[in-house]
Amino acid sequence: MVQMSGFQIESFLQTPRYAVFATNSIDGPPQLTTVWFLYESNVLYVGIERSSVKYRNLSRNPGVSMCIDGEHPDGHTVVVYGEAEFMETGTPDFDGILWRLTRRYHDSDEDARG
């Protein structure tokens, strides 16, 4: 497979796609979840609930991996490794990012609010 350029990766990440988000479980294999993501200013944002296994895993070990798959027939894939950081809920930054993350996967503002 041909490696994408930085410009191609930036463009690829601007398209709403599903990502497989992996956290490190406490006593076994990685915990994998399909997630929505938002890419802005060289940062990937993923929304998770405080009650989720992902949150508990990340609280203990912030290491993450993501695999963002392209649609066939292009076959492109972007794989990312890094450390998660939590954002405080209820702040203007958090609310804006959460809205943009949600909105990008819906056809209209009304659908996103639904």
Name each model-derived stretch.
Residues 1-4, 76-114:
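Charged, gly/pro-rich active-site loop segments
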Residues 1-18, 74:
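Extreme N-terminal tail/first-helix region
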Residues 16-50, 56-58, 64-69, 77-79:
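Short beta-strand segments
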Residues 69-70, 113:
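Short loop/turn and capping residues at structural boundaries
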